Every structure is written in structure tokens, then in C-alpha cells.
């Protein structure tokens, strides 16, 4: 069993109170049954999350919308699981959705996992979204340093020369300076 799946199933087992419905969802091999959980009324969040995660790992695109909603959830473990499944889903809409979540100023408190997902995806949307998000985080007294740091580290990982100006700006921020130096060192010299 995949380590991320093991962690998620253990967390959801506790949430579900070890119910028979939980055990059935963990055991079923029927993707149609899992997809039905995503749309059936009255399903608990743990059931929808488990079904979406399992479908995502199987590459079943019916999980996409549910996983995107979970990626933007206020509970970080749900975001982590959704990002993991979305990275393996293979849906071409994933990068656009992650970029939209990462750059949404109304939901910036929940942008950490969309930012990390963009780095993992290495999609055309990744660098522009990370640059935009980081530019906004460089404002004075911005409270979202973890998001800013993830952007700096991600831009270094992606190694795109378009990130050089914003990373240079990040050098002036003590909480980001060391990571910005490392990120800039990973970006090829332009010109």
C-alpha cells in the first residue's frame, strides 16, 4: 500500500469511527461505486475524500472536482492528500486549477499546497503562478511567509529565468533571503 494512502486511510478510519461503510469503501475495487460516493447526497466528507483519493490514484478523472475542492480545504491533511492524488491523476485541468487556487488572494491562507502541487507538476502555468503569488507575498507585513517560502523554493526547483527578478526582490526579506540565494543559484544566467 502506498504510504500516502496508508496515512490517509488511517486518518479517515478515525474520522469514520471504523464504520462498516468505511471498511467497504477501503475494500471496494469498483471505480463506479467510488464515483457514486462523490455525487450521492448525504455522504460524509471522509467518504468523499477517500473515494476521490482512490479514484485519483487510479487515474479516474471523475475525481478531479472533488480533489480540487479538497486541495483548497482549511484542513492541511486534506490538502496534502488531494495534492498527492491530483499529481497522479493525469488530468490536464489540474495545473490551471492549482494556479487559480495559488493566485486567489481571497484564499491565500490555503495556497501552500496548490503552490507545492504546481512545482511538482512543472506545467506551463507553474512559473507564472508562483511569480504572481510571490510578488503579492513580498508586501510589507504579509502574514503568509510559508506560502512565500514555498514559492521561492519552488521557483528555484523549476529553474526558470523568468523568476530571477522576483527572487532578487525576495533577497530583501530576512525570512526569505537564504532560500532566495539558493533559488537564484539554481537558475541559469540569462543573456
Sequence positions of predicted segments:
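Conserved hydrophobic register position within alpha-solenoid helical repeats
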Residues: 18-22, 51, 82, 114, ...
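Amphipathic alpha-helical scaffolding segments comprising HEAT/armadillo-like alpha-solenoid repeats
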Residues: 2-8, 26-40, 60-72, 91-104, ...
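A contiguous pocket-lining binding segment that forms or flanks enzyme active sites
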Residues: 107-116, 120
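Extended alpha-helical scaffolding segments
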Residues: 144-169
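Non-membrane alpha-helical segments in proteins
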Residues: 19-20, 45-57, 80-85
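Short inter-helical turns and helix N-cap capping residues of alpha-solenoid HEAT/ARM repeat scaffolds
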Residues: 42-44, 74-75, 106-107, 144, ...
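Residue-level detector of extended alpha-helical repeat arrays and alpha-solenoid scaffolds
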Residues: 18, 48, 79, 95, ...
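Core register positions within helices of long alpha-helical scaffolds
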Residues: 21-25, 54, 85-88, 117, ...
Amino acid at each position: 500500500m502506498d504510504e500516502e494512502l496508508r496515512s490517509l486511510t488511517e486518518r479517515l478510519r478515525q474520522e469514520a469511527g471504523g464504520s462498516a461503510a468505511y471498511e467497504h469503501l477501503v475494500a471496494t475495487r469498483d471505480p463506479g461505486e467510488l464515483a457514486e460516493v462523490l455525487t450521492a447526497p448525504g455522504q460524509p466528507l471522509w467518504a468523499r475524500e477517500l473515494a476521490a483519493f482512490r479514484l485519483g490514484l487510479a487515474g479516474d478523472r471523475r475525481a478531479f472536482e472533488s480533489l480540487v475542492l479538497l486541495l483548497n480545504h482549511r484542513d492541511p491533511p486534506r490538502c496534502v492528500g488531494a495534492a498527492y492524488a491530483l499529481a497522479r491523476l493525469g488530468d490536464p485541468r489540474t495545473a490551471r486549477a492549482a494556479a487559480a487556487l495559488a493566485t486567489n488572494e481571497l484564499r491565500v491562507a490555503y495556497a501552500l499546497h496548490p503552490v507545492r502541487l504546481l512545482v511538482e507538476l512543472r506545467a506551463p502555468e507553474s512559473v507564472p503562478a508562483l511569480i504572481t503569488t510571490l510578488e503579492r507575498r513580498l508586501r510589507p507585513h504579509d502574514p503568509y511567509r510559508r506560502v512565500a517560502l514555498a514559492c521561492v523554493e519552488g521557483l528555484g526547483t523549476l529553474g526558470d529565468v523568468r523568476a530571477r527578478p522576483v527572487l532578487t526582490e525576495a533577497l530583501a526579506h530576512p525570512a526569505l533571503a537564504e532560500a532566495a540565494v539558493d533559488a537564484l543559484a539554481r537558475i541559469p544566467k540569462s543573456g
